[in-house]
Amino acid sequence: MCIRDSPDLLLILVPRHPERFKDAREMVQKGGFSFTLRSSGEIPSGSTQVVIGDTMGELMLLYGIADLAFVGGSLVERGGHNPLEPAAHAIPVLMGPHTFNFKDICAKLQQADGLITVTDADSVVKEVSTLLTDEDYRLWYGRHAVEVLHQNQGALTRLLQLLQPYLPQRSH
């Protein structure tokens, strides 16, 4: 499955750092894709193939309209980005094998069928194709991803409760 072959697909490409916005735009232009910039405020048309998220602070909004998410920085040895952000929207999370920045949560997501590990462009295409054509498969992974998030909420409160006997009492 490819954007060129599937006119109803829309890729939302969000560079992690603002200095990469220009590179993303040039890459999309060079590929010959029809695109809009999020910063333009333009609503994507039926012929838009890519939306470049070139604004700050809107990643969670963009995950909220997605059917699945590939979390970058993980196919190369950068360590990946936060998989809990897409998991919060109950969408399948795909990441490469380099997840050392979020090792523990990625392990939990993997064990719970909330994370799909891909190794290269071909495996990304294969998994995305399966997720987009098999709704049950897509919903399964999304449901398990958000369950991991719910199971791990409140960690700070639990930690503070455990530490309470050892913390000095504050006088009011």
What annotation goes with each model-predicted range?
Residues M1:
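Phosphate/diphosphate ligand-binding glycine-rich loop within oxidoreductases
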